[in-house]
Amino acid sequence: MLDPQPLKGRTAVVTGSGQNIGEAIVKLFSAAGANVVVNGGSSREKVDKVVDDIKASGGNAIGVMADVGDAGAVEAMVKEAADTFGTVDIAVSNVSVRKKQRVEDISVKEWQDTINTNLNSAFYLARCVVPLMKQSGWGRIIHISGVDGFAAHVPTRTHNITCKAGVHAFAKALALELGPSGITANTVSPGAIDTTRDWSQYDDPELWRKARIESIPVKRIGTVDDIANACLYLAGETGGFISGE
């Protein structure tokens, strides 16, 4: 029989959890018994709403505003999580920016900012939670990445594709290094997911959507709950033999 609360007693930090995929993850983790840290970088209102929803459902949650591209802010967030709940057992890195630009049009600052948000943020979070996980001999690190990390599918996304490939490599390196300490590290690559994204960025949004559906074996766009369920599997004892994926 499946445990209805497989994360009972665990503490999870989920970055970018004020909306969309991150919100679905943090709410599912709470329903599974975890204490959760809801993070946002710009909208306090969204973070507070998610925290209120979780508390109304009987869960334990705090909201922490922090720019995940700022190493000091991430360190302070993890410290607040540990001070509040005792430790951090699960860390989900779920922040990404994406913009269509030809490589010759990307400024050095835009390149560096994208790398910092999409790739460095995963490192900033991992370096802070790993000591806590090593102390307990148990930990789960999950990166929300993207299919761009496997192959370059769309032109004008050079900076994003580079970051996603880096995130995948980072997870594999973490898995190799941290496995003996009881810590797993994996990526989840959502693909086409229904979120609040602006579909108007595409020249023909409906044509693009139909083409994506046709390329997906199950013939539908994914939901945020699909991604949250995958993360829940990796975050519990069920994911204990999966690492470096």
Regions found by a protein language model. Name each.
Residues F85, F123, W138, R220-E245:
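C-terminal substrate-recognition "lid" of short-chain dehydrogenase/reductases
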Residues T11, G18-N20:
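Conserved glycine-rich cofactor-binding loop
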Residues G179, T184, I242-G244:
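Short, small/polar-rich loop/turn modules that mediate ligand/substrate recognition or access, typified
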Residues I142-G166, A171-P180, A192-I193:
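Catalytic loop of short-chain dehydrogenase/reductase
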Residues R102-V103, E110-I115, W208, R212:
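Substrate-binding pocket helix/loop in short-chain dehydrogenase/reductase
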Residues P131, L176-E177, G240:
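Alpha-helical segment proximal to the catalytic Tyr-Lys
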Residues D3, D48, D105, P155-R157, ...:
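A glycine/serine/threonine-rich, flexible loop-to-helix segment
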